[in-house]
Amino acid sequence: MDSGTKVKKGAAGRRSGGGPKKKPVSRSVKSGLQFPVGRIGRYLKKGRYSKRVGTGAPVYLAAVLEYLAAEVLELAGNAARDNKKNRIIPRHVLLAVRNDEELGTLLKGVTIAHGGVLPNINPILLPKKSEKAASTTKTPKSPSKATKSPKKS
């Protein structure tokens, strides 16, 4: 053995020096999500929902939250475009959520601040079409034919 050369010993399983350091990649980037997986995991642990939290739970929850947010934003953007607006306001979010069947049931008990209410008029309160107005619009009768009596032969 050569006692002049010193061999560096690092921690087991780790690379000890040499190559360039790898840049850390977040779990959000690894999973292809925009929502913060690490923060959601921290909230799950801090909230004491369970003694232990698996590694896949925050990723799954972040994916679900991101999907719901994208769905609501898409429908609210459509509602804003229908109203000829470029900016989404709480009214557009309310219209989007309440007009969608599945989101409406999911967020049934939720109050959206400054959202207002859905426009709704009870059909009983709407004006009825009268029989006279309906008959005059269908076939107009001329008064000359109504006064003449049929000829007898």
Curated annotation (Swiss-Prot):
Residues 1-30, 129-153 are annotated as: Disordered. Keywords: Chromosome, DNA-binding, Nucleosome core, Nucleus. Not ubiquitinated. CDD domains: HFD_H2A. InterPro entries: Histone-fold, Histone_H2A, Histone_H2A/H2B/H3, Histone_H2A_C. Residues 1-12 have a biased composition (Basic residues). One of its GO terms (cellular component) is nucleus. GO terms for molecular function: DNA binding; protein heterodimerization activity; structural constituent of chromatin. A motif (SPKK motif) lies at residues 149-152. It comes from the Eukaryota. It is found in: Nucleus; Chromosome. Residues 133-147 have a biased composition (Low complexity). The keyword DNA-binding applies. Pfam families: Histone, Histone_H2A_C. The nucleosome is a histone octamer containing two molecules each of H2A, H2B, H3 and H4 assembled in one H3-H4 heterotetramer and two H2A-H2B heterodimers. The octamer wraps approximately 147 bp of DNA. Contains one SPKK motif which may interact with the minor groove of A/T-rich DNA sites. Phosphorylation of this motif may regulate DNA binding. This motif is reiterated in both termini of histone H1 and in the N-terminus of sea urchin histones H2B, but its presence in the C-terminus seems to be unique to plant H2A. Belongs to the histone H2A family. PANTHER family: HISTONE H2A. Core component of nucleosome. Nucleosomes wrap and compact DNA into chromatin, limiting DNA accessibility to the cellular machineries which require DNA as a template. Histones thereby play a central role in transcription regulation, DNA repair, DNA replication and chromosomal stability. DNA accessibility is regulated via a complex set of post-translational modifications of histones, also called histone code, and nucleosome remodeling. This is Probable histone H2A.4. It comes from Arabidopsis thaliana.
